[in-house]
């Protein structure tokens, strides 16, 4: 469980933030500022402690649905919505901070960006980065969002945008909602197929990366396909 310390002698979080800066506040205090008020049973600091004590880590916030958050904290719909909005805003800030504006250098560089973007998705997403001859991103394209009837994508869909963008190379990324990053037999077949199709058109498939919310698998780093 997430460890919480509650010190009743501390000044209220807003005053501490003004005096010491946001970086000096605990997670409990920062959450209390977002909650603003407690409920009938708990003071706002107690309520934030209660919520955090039910999490293994702060990353669990992102995986919780609006209904789960509202039920767990007993904070009502409005506060739950505000927390979810804050989480999404933070995710977008992090994604922007990790945007690959220059050259793509390593698989881990791509994986970190896509773990933040796709790690918490409940459905399988397939994203392709199309690169120029200096490994700069021309376009980041979501090719499909998976359903029970369909898994991954056909090479023609991926190559259509490669030709449209006059891409020299590409990187394929998809997530495993289960959290297990080990590639399936279908993942291997798909990787071989897209790599072969790229070669037929003179386009380089640099990597196929599988991501979860906390880890990744790179076919270039760990398989013999590249």
Curated annotation (Swiss-Prot):
The UniProt keyword set, sorted, is:
Hydrolase, Metal-binding, Metalloprotease, Protease, Zinc
Motif (JAMM motif) positions are 174-187
What family does this belong to?
Answer: Belongs to the UPF0758 family.
Taken from the UniProt record, the cysteine pairs bridged by disulfide bonds within this chain are none
Q: Which positions are annotated as binding Zn(2+)?
A: 174, 176, 187
Against Gene3D superfamilies, the record matches this protein to: Cytidine Deaminase, domain 2
Known PANTHER family for this protein?
Answer: DNA REPAIR PROTEIN RADC, UPF0758 PROTEIN YEES-RELATED
Q: What GO MF annotations does this protein's record show?
A: metal ion binding; metallopeptidase activity
GO terms for biological process, alphabetical: proteolysis
Source organism, top-level taxon: Bacteria
Regions that span the bilayer: none
Q: Which ranges form a coiled coil? A: none
Protein name, entry field: UPF0758 protein SPy_1118/M5005_Spy0840
Annotated MPN domain ranges read 103-225
Q: Which InterPro entries match?
A: MPN, RadC_JAB, RuvA_2-like, UPF0758, UPF0758_CS, UPF0758_N
Establish whether keyword Zinc-finger is in the entry: no
């Amino acid at each position: 469980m997430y460890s919480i310390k509650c010190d009743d002698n501390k000044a209220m979080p807003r005053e501490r933030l003004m005096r010491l800066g946001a970086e000096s506040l605990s997670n409990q205090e920062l959450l209390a500022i977002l909650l603003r008020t407690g409920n009938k049973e708990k003071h706002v600091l107690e309520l934030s402690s209660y919520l955090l004590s039910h999490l293994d880590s702060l990353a669990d916030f992102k995986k919780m649905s609006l209904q789960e958050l509202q039920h767990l904290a007993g904070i009502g719909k409005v506060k739950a919505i505000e927390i979810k909005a804050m989480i999404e805003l933070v995710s977008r800030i992090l994604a922007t901070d990790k945007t690959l504006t220059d050259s793509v250098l390593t698989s881990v560089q791509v994986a970190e960006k896509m773990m933040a973007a796709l790690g918490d998705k409940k459905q399988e997403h397939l994203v392709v980065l199309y690169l120029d001859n200096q490994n700069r991103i021309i376009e980041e394209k979501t090719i499909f969002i998976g359903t029970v009837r369909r898994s991954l994508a056909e090479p023609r869909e991926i190559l259509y945008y490669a030709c449209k963008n006059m891409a020299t190379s590409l990187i394929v990324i998809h997530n495993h909602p289960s959290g297990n990053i080990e590639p399936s037999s279908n993942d291997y077949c798909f990787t071989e197929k897209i790599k072969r199709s790229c070669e037929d058109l003179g386009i380089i498939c640099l990597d196929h990366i599988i991501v979860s919310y906390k880890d990744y698998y790179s076919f270039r780093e760990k398989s013999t396909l590249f």
